[in-house]
Amino acid sequence: MDEESLDGLLFKDHDFSSDLLRQLNSLRQSRILTDVSICAGAREIPCHRNVLASSSPYFRAMFCSSFREKSEAKVQLKGIDPPTLDQIVSYVYTGEAHIATDNVLPVMEAASMLQFPKLFEACSSYLQSQLAPSNCLGMIRLSEILSCETLKKKAREVALTSFPEVAASADLKELCALELRDYLGDDGLCGEEEKVFEALMVWIKHDLQARKRYMQELFKQVRLQYIHPAFFHHFIANDALLQSSPACQIILETAKRQMFSLCGTTVPDCKLLLHVPPRNSYQDFLILLGGRKDSQQTTRDVLLYSKQTGQWQSLAKLPTRLYKASAITLHRSIYVLGGMAVSSGRSLVSHNVYIFSLKLNQWRLGEPMLVARYSHRSTAHKNFIFSIGGIGEGQELMGSMERYDSICNVWESMASMPVGVLHPAVAVKDQRLYLFGGEDIMQNPVRLIQVYHISRNSWFKMETRMIKNVCAPAVVLGERIVIVGGYTRRILAYDPQSNKFVKCADMKDRRMHHGATVMGNKLYVTGGRRLTTDCNIEDSASFDCYDPETDTWTSQGQLPHKLFDHACLTLQCIPRTSGLP
C-alpha cells in the first residue's frame, strides 16, 4: 500500500524484492556476473559473493573480512555433501528449501554451520512433527549435538508423556547413567512407579557388569512410596540384585518400615522418603458413588469429576444397588464394603466387598468381610481397611470392628469400640483412628470422641460438649481433622496434638448425609440433605469448596443431580494411563 505524506507519495512495490531475487537466481543459473564457486566434493556451484554475503553472517565474515576465501575463485565447504549444497544455494536465491526425511539432518547441520537460523528452525519443526515414542530419545541426543533447544524440549516432552512406550524401546537401554537418572527422576515423567522400576532393572541388566555400580543412585529415582505395596512385596523387597547392594538394602528397609509398619516412622531417612512428592502427571479426581439420587431409590451410578476440566464423567456402575454401604480408596483402587443389597422385593445385609479399577473401568468381587453390616463406617490406613460398627443382619447396633490386610487378602476381628454408635465422623491421623459423635440406637446424639490406637489394638474414649454431629463426614486437612456439619452448618477442626477444637467458617446450610473429601489441600463437600429455615428437609445437589488458607467457602456449581447418603472420595491416578482425557 502507498503512503501519502505532506510532501508527496511514498511508493512501495511489494513484489520488487522477490522479483529481484528471482532475477538474481536466473543470472546465477546462466552464470552471468558470478564471481565465486562454492564447492562440496566435486560439485561446484557458481554464485555471487554479494548475494552469499547478504544471506548469512557466515558468508559475510568469509567474503567481507580478511580471510583468504575473500579473493579465491573457489571455496570448498567441508562437512557438506553435494545434494545438501544444492539445497542451501537454492534457499539463498529463492528462500525455499525442500525438507524431507532423507535430507533433514544434513540440511539442518549445514544450516547450523552456515548460520541460516530460519532454515535451521524449519528443520527443527519438521523433526518435531516426526517425533514418536520410538525415536524421541534419539532426537534428544541429536538436539544436543545440534544445540537445538526447541527440538530438545519437544522430544523430552514426548519422552516424558509417553513413558510406557519409551521404556519398551531399544533406545532406553542405550542411555548413559546420567541421562537415565535425569529421565527417571523428572517430576514430569508420566508413568506409574512400578513401570519406572521395571525400566530401571531392564537398563541395568542390559550390561550388568558395567552398570551395576550405578544401581544405588538410580534406584533412588524410583518413588517407592507410590508403588503398590503388593508389587513392592513380591517384586522389589527381595530382588537378588538389589539385595546384593548394601546401599540399596538400606533403601529397601526404609521403604518396608514406611509401608508395612503400623508404628510411627521416626527414622530421618524414612521421613525423607515419605515426603517425596508424586510426579506431576498424577492428578486427584473426585468420585461420587451410590447413595440416593433425586429422592428415588438407591443408585448404582459412579461419577468422576476432574478439577482440571470441570467436567463430570460416568464410570462403570456398581454391580448392585447398595443402601448405606461404606467406601474408601486404597492404592488407587476403590473399595465398597457391605451395605444393604437392594433388589426387587428383597433387602439383604451384605458382607460383600467390591473393588473398582479406574484403569480397567471394572468392578470385581474382593474378599468378603467377616460380618455383614450396613450404616457402618470404613477408613484406610497404610495397607489396611478398618470397617467399624453399623447395623447387623438382625438389625442390631454393632460395636465390632474388623480389619482387612490388602497384602495378605485377609480380614480379622479387632477390638470393639467402647460405645456402639451409628453415623459417627471417622478419620485416621498419626497412627490413631478417631470416631467423633454419632447417635445411639434411639437416635440420641453421642457426645464422645472414641480413639483407637492402631498398633496397640486398643480404644479409649473422651467425653466432650463440643461434639454433637450425626451423619457427618470427617476429613484430614493438614494437621487437623475437620468434622463437616451433621444437622448443623458448623465446621469444627480438631487438633489431636492439643486435643482442642477450632471453629471454622460455617457452611451455607445445615447439612447431613452429605459427602466430603480433600483435593489439593482444599475441602470439597457434595450433596446431602439440608434443613431449610422453616425446618423442612430438602435433598441437595450443591458442590462447595472450603479453603483453609482463607477460611472461606466457594460454590463449585451443582452436581449432575441431587444426591445423599453417597460416598465422596478422592482417587489419585495418571489420566493418560487410566483412559481419562
Curated annotation (Swiss-Prot):
Q: For the BTB domain, which residue ranges apply?
A: 34-101
Q: Which domain of life is it from?
A: Eukaryota
InterPro entries in the record, alphabetically? BACK, Beta-prop_ATRN-MKLN-like, BTB-kelch_protein, BTB/POZ_dom, Kelch-typ_b-propeller, Kelch_1, KLHL38_BACK, SKP1/BTB/POZ_sf
Matching PROSITE patterns = BTB
Positions of the BACK domain: 136-237
Kindly list the biological process annotations in GO that this record carries: proteasome-mediated ubiquitin-dependent protein catabolic process
Show me the Kelch repeat boundaries: 285-332, 334-383, 384-431, 433-479, 480-521, 523-573
| Matches recorded under SMART domains | BACK, BTB, Kelch
Q: What is this protein called?
A: Kelch-like protein 38
Q: Which organism is it from?
A: Homo sapiens
Upper taxonomic lineage: Eukaryota, Metazoa, Chordata, Craniata, Vertebrata
